[in-house]
């Protein structure tokens, strides 16, 4: 496994550290003591010294002390420096508080943490009155740093954009509103850490400030020295995620009011995740592999990824046949205890390959009675929704009768509602906009909706006949983009059915 994933060590580029320090410089005249809790190669300390920030004492903490000597060599003699070779989660220095805490905490998912680290995270979060189930180590670093600020302290950290948008960070967002008088959040158009694959933000919190509130700014790149901070206190107390700070209060209030009048996706259908294979690269195969190992008896048709679907609203038999012809993974192995009692040598060869690749000891496979038997194959869905998308969310009728992986949610209509009407009603601007507002973004502009977010999307359901749906389908096939698909639907769904005024319609 990549060592960076284990240690969370994604060192801060000097230009990013300098950008933050330059922005903070006017607020650092009275800085007495500075702490960098995960110092790494010392990018922040280097830029603080280079910018002549007045400071009496610097403390640096890191689990790896190999950089300490280099950092110490650049710090002027008149500044006291304390070094601590330990995990910051265990750091304890007799309740010493700091004027500035600055850094880039490690990013390590819970499943890669050691038990001692998990226990430390729980203790830190519990002590702060928060839920103890930390999803990632950065949350504990963040909360502990807040607790070490003095009454006028400033916290400046490079954090994952998760803080603004994911469900588990909602509690953190409420927490920081109570801890800081002023908050500044700076977002970027581009990834700052390509290897991380995670959108990044700059968080700055001021314990005391003459200009209170929550301020946001988005910049294209670090060379852009023009930083305009805009206050948006409404979003911090609305049901929307902070990642949509660029929308003004009037727009957010308008959307919130509309959403309250409309039923949700969860009112019309049941949703379940698709098949969890535990190792798609092994259990989902193409036709060539199926032929080579004589696996025809053991496979079922499957659509693995949303990327394999064109911009369509029906996944047709022809589309699936094309997927097979292109050599894409399109068959899932469905072994059972019965059908593997007398397997031939070809099939056994394929199972041996899986054993040699150590899938048997994988986290999910190891929990199975027989490692290669996938549980809960379940049923073929009538329709499916891909939880991740690029240009727009995709909800499709499953004409091809294929299974789906857990990259999609299976759709089953509740009694009294029609699937074609549901698909038609989904493709309107309000529902698509809300998917952007309710979901979360990952590196490269990927939008994801977790099950709870998908189920609470508002959908102005209208019952239509098959003739109207066929017209919609034909129009969608010819459309150059999602905007063309939505335009015609909006007139009928939002104007005629939802009875929006011309002004409201244009605002949507």
Task: Enumerate the language-model features and the residues they cover.
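Structural motif
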Residues: 33, 100, 382-383
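Conserved class I S-adenosyl-L-methionine
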Residues: 30-40
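Short, charged, solvent-exposed linker or helix-capping segments at domain edges/interfaces
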Residues: 212-219, 315, 344, 466-471
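Non-catalytic DNA-recognition/assembly elements of restriction-modification systems
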Residues: 240-283, 346, 463-508
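Polybasic, glycine- and aromatic-enriched phosphate-binding surface used to engage nucleic acids
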Residues: 253-465
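Glycine-rich helix-loop-beta junction characteristic of Rossmann-like nucleotide cofactor-binding loops
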Residues: 23-29
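Signature of N6-adenine DNA methyltransferases within the class I
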Residues: 5-21, 38-56, 61-70, 80, ...
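N-terminal, positively charged/glycine-rich alpha-helical extensions of SAM-dependent methyltransferases
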Residues: 1-2
